[in-house]
Amino acid sequence: MIQYFASRKDRQHIIVQELPTKPESFIHLDMVFTMLAQDKCMAYSPLILQSNTGFNTTHIEIDNGQIRYHERNNFLEATKHVGFDLEPVLCGGNDSWYQQREQWHSGANFFALGEGKVLGYARNTHTIEALNNAGFDVLKAEDVCSGKEDMHAHERFVVTFEAAELPRGGGGARCMTMPVKRQKVNW
């Protein structure tokens, strides 16, 4: 893959985040990191923000066929190097026990409807509280579906929904979606 990008001659950046192989709640990046808005992301702090975790973060820079590898201290440091200086909203809030528990329940996995508009599990109460503290209005899915709440009246929001079987199987809000054709985001 790297050679393919190098053959294109334009500038490319690839960030590789090593993930734990166990438990299964770390199956892919969406389980520890999700873009919420142009300036904010949902992050599982022990893996995405901390240094010396034992899991490598590699920034691969490809420019005019030249390939350079840079080891970064953490994932958000790597995103900052490529022009995305993100403010993290912490999965599970500031408490390490809640972070671990809510990450296990797909607390970092959200489906983005648009800029600052996301869907996620209501069960991750500390994560939802962290989103609310970061300026996201909290809307219940049943209120949106019944017409009691209008999503369009909110600039930034998280729609929370109840679920039991999908989280038990290890899936998050994004895991339930099929590809969505969206308009290009000019970041």
Question: Could you say what each language-model-derived stretch is?
Answer:
Residues 1-187:
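The feature marks the mature, well-folded catalytic cores of soluble enzymes
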